[in-house]
Design a protein with these regions (language model features):
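Glycine/charge-rich, flexible interdomain linkers and switch-proximal surface loops
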Residues: 86-97, 137, 183-196, 233-243, ...
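Hydrophobic or amphipathic alpha-helical targeting/insertion segments
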Residues: 145-187
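N-terminal charge/polar-biased segments
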Residues: 1-56, 559-599
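Residue-level signature of catalytic and energy-coupling elements of molecular machines
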Residues: 82, 132, 156, 216, ...
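Extended amphipathic alpha-helical scaffolds
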Residues: 21-105, 170-421, 425-428, 592-599
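Extended, low-charge hydrophobic alpha-helical regions
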Residues: 64, 111-113, 412-599
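Glycine/serine-rich anion-binding loops at beta->alpha junctions
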Residues: 57, 127-137, 449-451
Length: 599
């Protein structure tokens, strides 16, 4: 019992130590009673003492809980794989409806509570940012890898042994992909179009596959920059902007060789709205009198002082405008403000001006027309002026005015203009276009292909089953399980188009066992039949496929390593701390980013 101190930690007492095979009974004391985190008799294992309000799962229970949560997430997106995929209708927090079959878009809208499920959602986001495609496949594969580990956990096989087998299988799977891949010529436009169309063929916009693939390829080829060292940079996210304007039809979508943004000139009546071969000046400084960083008090005793103050402001703005006029630009675009006095000066000189443009758009214009963003007007050089644009024009589309800086000579930035009947359709087309541009970028950077339609997965699975015989010890079980897990992709493709799954997969497995020449056979996602992907023309980029294998297997390994899940109401609150009447949720800095009730 407690000593004289009253609040000291009660030490765990062992009972029945003389009895053979008996284990000591340990008593836990909560931190709220004044205990410390650790306690224990000499020679005994220390006892972790936690808040009574906290929930804790350890050992096999934690592992199975993680696997169940991950499998539940993968089952959500399983029906969205392949050309016969189903759509998901999601109602987001703002009340708007999202219709999509994109794995990342679905999981982004779902609010999950389990930490393992959250890690699966992050997995999809990581895949999307890394290669732009394969978000659904990576979730399905990760869930299946974890599901295949359950029998080994039931047999009390240590997670480290399972992980060792999994990682060994991953190394061999990548090596097999290296053997299976087909190199293509970098300038083979037809082959590149077929690959991107195969990606778009699984999306909502299948009917417009050719249109979207053409848009994606044009955008990627426009922003492609050859680096001095021999490599190439293709920054689609930064330099290929997608502008959605409701109205018209999808056939009106096009890639603009330049930049489009929703702005009008500052003084429409006095500034020209169309300029051929414009000289463009880009600024990152305000053309209005800059207020002091700190609060400034000016004491004015007579009217002349006030007039002098206004004159000083006008002189400052006048000096800046004169610096600009000396450079003889036709169009001035600034990221900051533009005062009425400056507008008068510029309009009198016949210069069009646009203010408060986003920095990202300004950088895009600089890259498209060869300009340099200037930070001070007294530092403007003639080389800073962009002369590469063909035309600047302001057009009214619907109720909004849009500025076009297009027909650039050598644009390294572009805008994809999307038109469509409604915002929902435009949002889905944008998601599909993002995936298509990711695929096109991957092929241009790494021109190697792997057969699609589950052919690569089945070929790797067959080879892993053969190699498993040479793996020593119990590691061979999880090694073989990776091969079995990879078959989930062709199985899901067959399932989603209503084919007899068992019969189809058995035939495909037998076909792949025939050896050379049979490794390109997979599932036709439209009919559910077994066909040669080489003849069908369904290919996937090597970068996407190998990244899918790596990401899914490493995520499965990460979740298998977890043997303890501790979650409480609050990090700071002790036992019995009362919750507020209207609790609010905060993400905090918890290890699993779980939502917590504020104190």
């Amino acid at each position: 019992g407690p000593g004289a101190a009253g609040g000291a930690l009660t030490r765990p007492r062992a009972r029945g130590l003389t009895g053979a095979g008996r284990t000591p009974t340990l008593r836990q004391v909560s931190l709220a009673e004044g205990g410390s985190m650790m306690g224990g008799m000499p020679g005994q294992a220390p006892v972790m003492v936690v808040n009574q309000n906290a929930q804790r799962e350890t050992g096999r229970k934690a592992q199975l809980g993680n696997i169940t949560a991950a499998k539940a997430v993968s089952d959500i997106v399983r029906t969205t794989l392949g050309p016969r995929s189903m759509l998901k209708m999601l109602l987001d927090a703002q009340g708007s409806i999202v219709l999509t079959n994109d794995g990342n878009a679905i999981l982004r809208e779902i609010d999950v509570a389990h930490p393992a499920a959250k890690s699966m959602v992050d997995l999809s986001r990581a895949q999307d940012e890394e290669v732009g495609d394969g978000t659904t496949s990576v979730i399905i594969l990760a869930g299946e890898m974890l599901h295949c580990a359950v029998p080994f956990l039931d047999k009390k096989l240590h997670p480290t042994v399972i992980i060792r087998g999994y990682l060994r299988a991953l190394e061999d799977a990548i090596a097999i992909c290296d053997e299976l891949c087909y190199p293509i010529a970098e300038d083979d436009e037809k082959q590149l179009s077929n690959i991107v169309q195969a990606c778009v063929g699984t999306k909502f916009t299948t009917r417009f596959g050719t249109l979207i693939s053409d848009l994606a390829i044009q955008a990627v080829q426009t922003v492609r920059v050859e680096l001095p060292g021999g490599g190439r940079e293709i920054d689609v996210k930064k330099y290929a902007k997608v502008e959605k304007i409701p109205g018209g039809s999808l056939e009106d979508c096009r890639v603009l060789k330049g930049v489009l943004f929703a702005k009008d000139v500052v003084a429409p009546g006095r500034m020209p709205r169309k300029i051929e071969r414009p000289r463009i000046l880009l600024l990152d400084c305000p053309l209005e009198y800059k207020k002091g960083e700190n609060q400034t008090n000016v004491e004015i005793s007579k009217e002349e002082d006030w007039a002098a103050l206004l004159k000083a402001e006008e002189a400052w703005i006048s000096a800046r405008c004169n610096d600009i006029i000396k450079a003889k630009p036709d169009l001035v675009i600034t990221e900051k403000g533009l005062s009425d006095f400056a507008v008068t000066f510029l309009a009198r000189a016949g210069i069009s001006a646009i203010r408060r443009l986003r920095k990202t758009d300004n950088n895009r214009i600089a890259r498209a027309c060869g300009a340099t963003v200037v930070h001070r007007t007294d530092e403007i050089k003639d080389s800073d002026i962009g002369t590469g644009a063909g035309v600047f024009e302001v057009k009214k589309i619907g109720d909004e005015y849009f500025s076009f800086i297009v027909d650039c000579d050598a644009p390294k930035a572009c805008t994809v203009l999307l038109r469509g009947a409604s915002k929902d359709i435009l949002n889905e087309v944008e998601r599909n276009l993002h995936d298509a541009m990711g695929v096109a970028r991957n092929v241009v950077q790494d021109p190697r292909l792997l057969p699609g339609g589950g052919a690569t997965e089945m070929a790797v699975a067959t080879r892993l089953q053969e190699k498993a015989a040479s793996v020593p010890g119990v590691e061979a079980w999880p090694y073989r399980a990776v091969g079995a897990a990879l078959e989930v992709i062709p199985r899901t493709l067959a399932q989603n188009c209503g084919a007899n799954v068992i019969r189809t997969i058995t035939k495909l497995r037998a076909k792949h066992l025939e050896g050379e020449g049979a490794q390109t056979f997979g599932i036709d996602g439209n009919a559910g039949t077994i066909v040669d992907m080489k003849e069908l023309g369904v290919w996937e980029p090597y970068a996407v496929k190998t990244q899918t294998f790596k990401t899914s297997l490493e995520a499965a390994v990460l979740l298998l390593r977890i043997d303890d899940i501790l979650s409480g109401l609050s990090r700071k609150g002790g036992a019995g701390s009362a919750a507020p009447q209207k609790p609010t949720t905060t993400t905090g800095d918890d290890v699993d980013s779980e939502q917590q009730l504020a104190e």
